């Protein structure tokens, strides 16, 4: 089915089922800029003429962001009055773990992509995984800090899921690593959000894995139970997103001046 056909079919479904009137075209699966510029333009424009389209969201990798593609999107945004967002898979700022999980890019490529996107006047979403084997709470905190410093607009959280028949699946079945507990994951999510800029919009707290061949996903717990646990942890801490967002603009100097005034 062509992109245009997918757009028309899904639009009709949401109009009928949810009485929706405005839509965002979401190019999610795989790396949506890993193609020629001409192919990319054709795919993006498949829904661009729809008068009910208000935005386009494009998922891709940090090492597949190029100025020519961004300039096309910036022009489209201006000419069609659309919100355009680029969703990047960061996962973690832990350089060693990015290598270990074979991401194929490092933190540098992510930073470069975000800066280029922002220069073109587009928004960006950070996709992060807070329970990667080898990551600690310090990695979680630093991930929140880097995202905040870069002025990312949106964030999506997803726990790690393991699919059979993959290298990660083989390592999991061999006992090469273990997953943290659900409670520890909940605590990491809350800590991450405490250090995150409160202006960053959370698009997703809990994700789902594919239906088939899963070895591990969400501790075999319903997504809404995980969400409720996150809410409960916030209440227990009497906390909220951004409660520890105090580390920018020369924190050490501000603390020194505060002590001197005291």
Predicted regions and their residues:
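Conserved C-terminal portion of the radical SAM core fold
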Residues: 108-167, 183-206
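Short, small-residue-enriched loops and turns at beta-alpha junctions
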Residues: 31-35, 62-65, 131-136, 163, ...
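Distinct, well-ordered alpha-helical segments
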Residues: 37-45, 66-77, 98, 140
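Acidic (Asp/Glu)-rich catalytic clusters
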Residues: 14-18, 43-51, 71-83, 115-119
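Core AdoMet radical
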Residues: 1-10, 14-37, 52-65, 82-109, ...
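Alpha/beta enzyme core
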Residues: 44-51, 56, 83-86, 144-150
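Auxiliary Fe-S-binding modules of radical SAM enzymes
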Residues: 154, 162-262
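Alpha-helix N-cap and loop-to-helix initiation/capping positions
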Residues: 2, 35, 39, 101-109, ...
């Amino acid at each position: 089915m062509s992109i245009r056909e997918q757009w028309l079919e899904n639009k009709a479904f949401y109009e009928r089922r949810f009485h929706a009137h405005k839509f965002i075209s979401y190019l999610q699966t795989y790396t949506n800029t890993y193609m020629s510029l001409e192919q990319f333009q054709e795919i993006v424009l498949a829904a661009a003429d729809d008068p009910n389209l208000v935005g386009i969201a494009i998922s891709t990798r940090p090492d597949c962001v190029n100025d020519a593609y961004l300039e096309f999107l910036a022009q489209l945004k201006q000419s069609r009055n659309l919100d355009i967002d680029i969703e990047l898979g960061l996962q973690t700022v832990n350089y060693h773990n990015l290598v270990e999980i074979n991401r194929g890019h490092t933190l540098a490529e992510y930073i470069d992509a975000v800066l280029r996107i922002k220069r073109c006047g587009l928004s960006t979403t950070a996709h992060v995984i807070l329970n990667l084997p080898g990551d600690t709470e310090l990695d979680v905190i630093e991930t929140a800090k880097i995202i905040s410093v870069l002025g990312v607009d949106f964030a999506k959280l997803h726990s790690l899921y393991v699919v059979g028949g993959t290298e990660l699946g083989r390592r999991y079945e061999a006992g090469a690593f273990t997953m943290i507990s659900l409670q520890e994951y909940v605590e990491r999510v809350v800590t991450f959000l405490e250090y995150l800029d409160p202006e960053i919009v959370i698009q997703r707290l809990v994700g789902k894995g594919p239906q088939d061949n899963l070895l591990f996903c969400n501790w075999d717990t319903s997504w809404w139970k995980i969400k409720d646990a996150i809410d409960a942890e916030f209440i227990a801490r009497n906390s909220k997103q951004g409660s520890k967002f105090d580390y920018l603009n020369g924190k050490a100097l501000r603390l020194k001046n505060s002590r001197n005034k005291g």
